[in-house]
């Protein structure tokens, strides 16, 4: 951190915080706790995790909250346990049981075959208890109000869906899986659909842990308890931008120019990328359109340099 960066600049303490979320708390609970621990209201999160789920949750702190809208968190990875033979209202363990069936006779080969059909580019109906909007209202709110509705299938990509262990629990079968998928994929819906395909009764998740979001993994993450012992971001704003985006080196004159909102000559990089000055600081996020590489976010405007 440069000595020129004053506390009032919003750059001191700015960066991404990667939290290993505990079960039983909401993503908003995590944000509220981090605001207290870091002593700032400027904390936001990218994406959410269900209360039952644990694992990687990406937060922005101070000026880095503006990075969140540009992060390409389009791929995610999970470990999960699916219970076959029992369907719930939420497709996870937090819901009420609505149907049961004996799954003990399901073979490993049958499970593998149906897992295969749920892998690749698929059409998935999201879980009904979700944040998806139906006529302007959240699906989970409609469920609580007792209203009936149907969610349309969505195109999602499940690049990996692998069974790593199986256990028989009486009439139920618990299957440990690893999933890599596109943003918008509901692992709860995979559990539901696997159960329906195998025994006619939707399965549900008994555990879910997110191990990766985009380039951010559990290796970057800290629990709230660890954060309380040593408050601070996981990646400062420079490391965050350079981890999350492709980058381009710029000279001092170019850095000064884009810090004042001017554009540079394009060099053929697709999508949003970071412009890095000779000292290693991220000056701006740029995007090329036609004959210009223009800023979509100035990380270090001239007034803060």
From Swiss-Prot:
This enzyme's EC code(s): 5.4.99.25
| Keyword tRNA processing in record | yes
The GO annotation for biological process reads: mRNA pseudouridine synthesis; tRNA pseudouridine synthesis
Q: Where, by residue number, is the active site?
A: 50
The protein's GO terms of the molecular function aspect are:
RNA binding; tRNA pseudouridine(55) synthase activity
Broadest EC class? Answer: isomerase
Species annotation: Rhodococcus jostii (strain RHA1)
Q: InterPro entries of this UniProt entry?
A: PsdUridine_synth_cat_dom_sf, PsdUridine_synth_N, PUA-like_sf, PUA_sf, tRNA_psdUridine_synth_fam2_C, tRNA_psdUridine_synth_TruB, TruB_C
What does the record give as the reaction this protein catalyses?
Answer: uridine(55) in tRNA = pseudouridine(55) in tRNA
Q: Does the keyword tRNA processing apply?
A: yes
Q: What keywords would UniProt list here?
A: Isomerase, tRNA processing
Its biological purpose = Responsible for synthesis of pseudouridine from uracil-55 in the psi GC loop of transfer RNAs.
Identify this protein by name: tRNA pseudouridine synthase B
Family membership, please give it: Belongs to the pseudouridine synthase TruB family. Type 1 subfamily.
């Amino acid at each position: 951190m440069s000595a020129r960066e004053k506390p009032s600049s919003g750059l001191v303490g700015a960066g991404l915080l990667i939290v290993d979320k505990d079960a039983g708390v909401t993503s908003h609970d995590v944000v509220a706790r981090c605001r207290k621990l870091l002593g700032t209201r400027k904390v936001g999160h990218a994406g959410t995790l269900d209360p039952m789920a644990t694992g990687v949750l990406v937060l922005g702190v101070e000026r880095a909250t503006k990075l969140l809208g540009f992060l390409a968190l389009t791929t995610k990875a999970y470990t999960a346990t699916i219970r076959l033979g029992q369907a719930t209202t939420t497709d996870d363990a937090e819901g009420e049981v609505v149907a049961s069936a004996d799954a003990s006779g399901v073979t490993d080969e049958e499970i593998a075959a149906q897992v295969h059909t749920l892998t690749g580019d698929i059409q998935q109906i999201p879980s009904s208890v979700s944040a998806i909007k139906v006529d302007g209202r959240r699906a989970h709110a409609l469920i609580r109000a007792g209203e009936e509705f149907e969610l349309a299938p969505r195109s999602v990509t499940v690049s990996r869906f692998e069974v790593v262990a199986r256990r028989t629990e009486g009439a139920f079968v618990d299957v440990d899986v690893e999933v890599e998928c596109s943003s918008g994929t509901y692992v709860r819906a995979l559990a539901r659909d696997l159960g329906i395909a195998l025994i006619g009764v939707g399965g549900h998740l008994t555990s879910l842990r997110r191990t990766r979001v985009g380039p951010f993994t559990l290796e970057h993450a800290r629990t709230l308890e660890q954060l309380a012992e040593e408050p601070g971001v996981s990646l400062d704003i420079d490391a965050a931008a350079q981890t999350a985006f492709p980058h381009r080196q710029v000279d001092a004159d170019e850095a000064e120019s884009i810090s004042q909102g001017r554009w540079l000559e394009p060099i053929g990089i697709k999508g949003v990328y970071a412009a890095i000055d000779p000292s290693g600081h991220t000056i701006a996020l740029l995007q090329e359109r036609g004959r210009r590489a223009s800023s979509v976010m100035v990380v270090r405007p001239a007034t803060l340099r």
